[in-house]
Amino acid sequence: TPDYGHYDDKDTLDANTPVDKTSNTLRVPDILALVIFAVVFLVGVLRNALVVWVTAFEAKRTINAIWFLNLAVADFLSCLALPILFTSIVQHHHWPFGGAACRILPSLILLNMYASILLLATISADRFLLVFNPIWCQNFRGAGLAWIACAVAWGLALLLTIPSFLYRVVREEYFPPKVLCGVDHGHDKRRERAVAIARLVLGFVWPLLTLTMCYTFLLLRTWSRRATRSTKTLKVVVAVVASFFIFWLPYQVTGMMMSFLEPSSPTFLLLKKLDSLCISFAYINCCINPIIYVVAGQGFQGRLRKSLPSLLRNVLTEESMVRESKSFTRSTVDTMAQKT
């Protein structure tokens, strides 16, 4: 029986797919996925719960706190859904949660995963504007605009999730007996490919380009001013962009390939076996980015001396960036005054 119990838009129910006689044993990719899910759940739930607590109750009501609060909420909800993924894989992709849950729960997982990606791109764009257009930021950058940007990111994530909600169904198998949850596009291959292309462009290529462009220009500006040529800035830039690319690339590439393959082809079946592992890989990115900012933004001895909540408050407050923006604004105004 084919493994259609995963939780992404790549799942396709096709009665003509050959029977997989090894479905009664967990494959190596599934075992690796279970290990990754367990680690991400334990680390991600605790870390994101702490970030939510700090940003909501302890940190100053800064714009950075708004960004990271939304990002942590998305990551936290994604991590809470991991026991569902874990249970289904352990049961050889059997779906015991019913038809309504088949539509809602996997769609919520996708919603939160895409929201995390788009919020990360929004944070990067905000930092870009803060450095390159500080006067505009002083005049217009506020909490209200930040919440609007977050709402747009959540709304776009919702649009990316709609195909999963509309076309997800359950189907009963008999050899061996199990219930499968997957996306059924029927015989309309063009619709399936359109969904895959939209997911690739809006959920991967555009956020990746945003991250790369913003951090590249920020790095060039930092070097041109000779402000901080330490490896700290470079580590943050490389780590954020590289982690995004590494963890999401397998999920997106396999999804695109499967949308153009026949379900009965050997390549499709091979990619299906790797599906759980690709999803678990993408999940790692949902809990790693704030860790990158904390670890790369503090020296090792400083991290030892400070408590984790204190480190988070340090990262989430904007005092250093605000001082830099104000300093740059004053120098710009003074230069303009001298010219006039």
From Swiss-Prot:
Residue intervals annotated with topology Extracellular: 1-30, 87-103, 168-193, 259-275
One MF term in the entry's GO annotations: complement component C5a receptor activity
Entry keyword annotation includes Cell membrane: yes
Gene3D superfamilies the record matches: Rhodopsin 7-helix transmembrane proteins (1.20.1070.10)
GO CC annotation terms, alphabetical: apical part of cell; basolateral plasma membrane; cytoplasmic vesicle; plasma membrane
Keyword annotations from UniProtKB, A to Z: Cell membrane, Chemotaxis, Cytoplasmic vesicle, Disulfide bond, G-protein coupled receptor, Membrane, Phosphoprotein, Receptor, Sulfation, Transducer, Transmembrane, Transmembrane helix
UniProt cross-references to Pfam families, sorted A to Z: 7tm_1
Cysteine-cysteine disulfides: C102-C181
Statement: the UniProt record of this protein carries the keyword Cell inner membrane: no
Domain of life, per lineage: Eukaryota
Modified residues (Phosphoserine): S307, S310, S320, S325, S327, S331
Membrane-spanning parts: 31-57, 63-86, 104-125, 147-167, 194-219, 236-258, 276-296
Topological category with respect to the lipid bilayer: Multi-pass membrane protein
Cytoplasmic face residues: 58-62, 126-146, 220-235, 297-340
GO biological process: chemotaxis; complement receptor mediated signaling pathway; inflammatory response; mRNA transcription by RNA polymerase II; phospholipase C-activating G protein-coupled receptor signaling pathway; positive regulation of cytosolic calcium ion concentration; positive regulation of epithelial cell proliferation; positive regulation of ERK1 and ERK2 cascade
Entry similarity comment: Belongs to the G-protein coupled receptor 1 family.
The protein's role, per its UniProt record: Receptor for the chemotactic and inflammatory peptide anaphylatoxin C5a. The ligand interacts with at least two sites on the receptor: a high-affinity site on the extracellular N-terminus, and a second site in the transmembrane region which activates downstream signaling events. Receptor activation stimulates chemotaxis, granule enzyme release, intracellular calcium release and superoxide anion production.
Self-association and partners: Homodimer. May also form higher-order oligomers. Interacts (when phosphorylated) with ARRB1 and ARRB2; the interaction is associated with internalization of C5aR. Interacts (via N-terminal domain) with S.aureus chemotaxis inhibitory protein (CHIPS); the interaction blocks the receptor and may thus inhibit the immune response.
Identification of the protein by name: C5a anaphylatoxin chemotactic receptor 1
Organism the protein comes from: Macaca mulatta
